UniProtKB/Swiss-Prot annotation:
Residues of the signal peptide: none
RNA-binding among keywords: yes
GO annotation, biological process: mRNA catabolic process; negative regulation of translational initiation; positive regulation of translational initiation; regulation of carbohydrate metabolic process
Gene symbol of the encoding locus: csrA
Predominant location: cytoplasm
Function comment: A key translational regulator that binds mRNA to regulate translation initiation and/or mRNA stability. Mediates global changes in gene expression, shifting from rapid growth to stress survival by linking envelope stress, the stringent response and the catabolite repression systems. Usually binds in the 5'-UTR; binding at or near the Shine-Dalgarno sequence prevents ribosome-binding, repressing translation, binding elsewhere in the 5'-UTR can activate translation and/or stabilize the mRNA. Its function is antagonized by small RNA(s).
NCBIfam families linked to this entry: csrA, PRK01712.1
Gene3D superfamilies: Translational regulator CsrA
Protein name: Translational regulator CsrA
One Gene Ontology term, aspect cellular component: cytosol
The protein's assembly and partners: Homodimer; the beta-strands of each monomer intercalate to form a hydrophobic core, while the alpha-helices form wings that extend away from the core.
PANTHER family with a match to the protein in the record: CARBON STORAGE REGULATOR
Length: 65
């Protein structure tokens, strides 16, 4: 895992076309902005896990999403 330190307003690059910008810090919360191409899905981890779980559940049921 790469660990970086960024200040509010600073950006990091992932590849050539994804940027992650620190928008704000308040207490133990950090607001970030992600710019990525439309074909790249960006989700919070808990949402991604729910999507994966629903895919698995629908495959087990034999239905499609």
């Amino acid at each position: 895992m790469l660990i970086l330190t960024r200040r509010v307003g600073e950006t990091l690059m992932i590849g050539d076309d994804i940027t992650v910008t620190v928008l704000g810090v308040k207490g133990n919360q950090v607001r970030i902005g992600v710019n990525a191409p439309k074909d790249v899905a960006v989700h919070r981890e808990e949402i991604y896990q729910r999507i994966q779980r629903e895919k698995t559940d629908s495959e087990d049921d034999g239905s499609s999403v």
